[in-house]
Amino acid sequence: MLLYTTNPVQQDAFIQAAVGKGYKVVKLETMVDAAFINNVEMKWEGVQFVRVDADVVDNLIDKQENVDSVLSKDEVEQAKKLFEFQIPETTITVEVKGLSQDAAPVIATRPEFMRRMKDMASMGGGGMTAFYAQMPDEVNLTINGNHAIFQALLKEPDIDKQQKQARNLADLALLSQGLLKGAELTNFINRSVDLLK
């Protein structure tokens, strides 16, 4: 398993998390690199490239380490409901995992296969890649059930404030992936200002 980055600036948080766990991340930033990745994976058995932002770092390389979430089953369900919302042209899947306490509270990732297909379509690939270009973005929102912020958020008595804070956490994660644009970005900015009042 080889971790790589296509944009070290945009993917810096994911790179830092991987390096913090002792992994190395290679830079593959050009269009030639995308073809190289596919070619190597087809020709060399057992070699797999995974973009550093394809999943939370604890899931990228399976080391059979399971960290349990400190949230109860009811709190997990409550957290999932707080993060269920719609964004145009985006399919969002929400999951709660027990990650490191110092990991981000919410992490947005895009599945490796769909991201690759969309990347190839954006480079002018025909056939099935054109089909994938028309599909909505898929985003996994991983809620870090061990982050201290959720102990306070789930106990917040003001429901409106609780929902705004949850949405801001999700929007920060989406923003880190460059997936917050247009009206959604404007709403995030306005909501952030409102929460600071």
Model-identified regions with their sequence ranges:
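Long, intrinsically disordered, charge-dense linkers/tails
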Residues: 1-197
